[in-house]
């Protein structure tokens, strides 16, 4: 079996056709927005999902490495989405469908945290930092890190405010002009 035919997430094998279906859904959603009058629409890529703390815990092995099969799935989805948006933009008059690459910027933060002013890239700040997410990170959950701004992730999935700040300027610089 080719490595891109199936991705193992936890105990579930997911066919690549699922990722293709999602990108096709985004294509049709874009078309619906266009028909409702929208002319400038931005779509964020999938992030390097295999490098978020929860997926390092669940699929990264004992060393909690990035789960490359999940990153490959995200790259496949991003490739399909980008092509669909290009196709849509060339077929609809005055339509601007902008693919915004979050994948590579966030991956650079994760792989080179010190270059961007971070100390911790593989754990969230909340709880153990390995698996807690969203609702499990609340006022009753002890925050383990002394300085949240040292961390790229708040919980095991979502970036911190500091990480978002590090992403916003390059994202705007690379993409804002594509809307006009």
Task: Locate the predicted segments by residue.
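Oxyanion-hole/transition-state-stabilizing segment in secreted/luminal serine hydrolases
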Residues: 1-20, 32-35, 39-58, 151, ...
